[in-house]
Amino acid sequence: MIYNNISLNTITTTPLTYRDRITFEFSVHGTCVVFNLFLCIFFICRPHLLRTFKPTIFFVTLGTFVLSLPLFFLQFYLVVFLWSLVEPRYTIAVCTLVKCITSSTTSCAQVLPLAVAIYRYFIVVRNKKMPSWFVVVVHSIISFIFFVIAILNFPLGEFETNDQCAVLRFSKAMEAVRISLTLGLNLFAVFINVAIYTFVKKYDKRNVDVHRRRVQLTYSMLLQSMIPILVSIPLLVGSFDFYFGYTLPSGFTSRWYATTFLSPLLTPISSMLSLRTIRHELLSIILSSFLFTGTRKISNLVTKTSKTNVAPHSSDYSSA
């Protein structure tokens, strides 16, 4: 429903009927954000890994955590109030702005692998030395574009009903642009990583050890760039109901779309687990943290094994 006789200063609310949905979203997204924080701490406590993977895996890990915080705090705020049987009240302008910020930061988090892909393309294919802050500059430009798209909801949008706010200033055209741009940039990241992987496998003539590490890291980055696309498929399917009026099962539209909220965890963990250097250290922590004394011997064995099987200088990955 579209409203014409209201303004941005009109008071709107988040209805109690939104409680179950936001609770489910927060349980999924909040859990992933917390685990993402642990992954950030894991890197920070291991300077050798931090130095090695700072512009690649750590950048994506920290970036997804930071960019997931606005949505995390919004969900937490709504869950607390709605379970207290209080409907949050704010102006349409405030609710629209918050919605725009959380939507844009979510998209920015999903396209983080693109900056890494561009960075590695220059290093691997073009054989150029690039500073680690290059990924920050590239992603800042991409983020600015998303924020501009989000703000355009104000001049181009209309007052419509919404689940999060009873009335919201919203533009279907800008939302379609945001979703399409997110998907397009993710596909571009996959394309670049495939190009890098093909180059490394066929044309890279460096020594065997460097070549092996470069192939491993390239495969890891390719896997990482595919995760945001895979977890967003249910949301893309759900958009057919929103834009074209196709009827979808209620369970799909209220539950399966939430796979998008798995991205803050699956995107960084996929690349971390695909590299033996990181995977063995993570396994060592899990074993030493959650198992009893008897299995700590296994943890020590895993640690020793990882030190003998993995290249002794993980910093060699920095040249990959």
UniProtKB/Swiss-Prot annotation:
Lipid bilayer topology: Multi-pass membrane protein
Protein name: Uncharacterized protein ZK757.1
Gene Ontology CC annotations of this record: membrane
Signal peptide: none
Keywords attached to this entry: Membrane, Transmembrane, Transmembrane helix
Compartment(s) of residence: Membrane
Transmembrane feature ranges: 24-44, 65-85, 105-125, 132-152, 179-199, 226-246, 253-275
Domain of life: Eukaryota
